[in-house]
């Protein structure tokens, strides 16, 4: 049963987006929590938190729901997704390859592709998540001071 804070935030996210929020524990996540925002007719936004962080689940759920609120709170004409393209991925691999060549490092193609992909995807996640995440944390601190100890 979600806390009053989670219920309020999830209800607001569902009302704003027109899509319900499912919140559940998982012991297989690689992170503390994640969000799979509903797209292309999916029936729910899914927020998961790792069972190791159950003591912080109110904060983790509120933080992830903040991404839904920010995405759907923007005018539809101003919404966009940060994502990768095949040409961007190819350019990233080329840049990483050139850098290794300058260093005199010779990686097999499969390792180079794997490394370049990790760098490319990691940078994309950071560019997309960190600025918004900082704003969400500030919003939580201002609007839900009872979660401060979990932040």
Stretches with model-predicted labels:
Residues 45-61:
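Short pre-active-site segment immediately N-terminal to the catalytic Zn-binding motif
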Residues 41-48, 114-122:
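Short linear interaction motifs
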Residues 135-151:
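Pan-zinc metallopeptidase signature
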Residues 57-76:
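Active-site recognition of the HExxH zinc-binding catalytic motif
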């Amino acid at each position: 049963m979600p806390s009053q804070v989670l219920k309020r935030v999830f209800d607001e996210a569902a009302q704003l987006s027109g899509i319900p929020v499912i919140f559940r524990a998982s012991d297989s996540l690689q992170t503390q929590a994640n969000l799979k925002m509903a797209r292309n007719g999916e029936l729910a936004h899914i927020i998961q938190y790792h069972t190791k962080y159950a003591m912080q689940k109110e904060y983790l759920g509120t933080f992830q729901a903040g991404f839904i609120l920010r995405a759907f709170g923007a005018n539809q004409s101003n919404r966009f997704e940060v994502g990768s393209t095949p040409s961007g991925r190819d350019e990233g691999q080329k840049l990483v390859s050139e850098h290794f060549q300058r260093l005199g490092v010779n990686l097999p193609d499969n390792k180079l592709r794997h490394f370049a992909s990790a760098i490319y995807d990691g940078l994309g996640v950071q560019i997309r998540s960190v600025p918004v995440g900082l704003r969400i944390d500030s919003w939580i601190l201002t609007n839900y001071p009872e979660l401060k100890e979990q932040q």
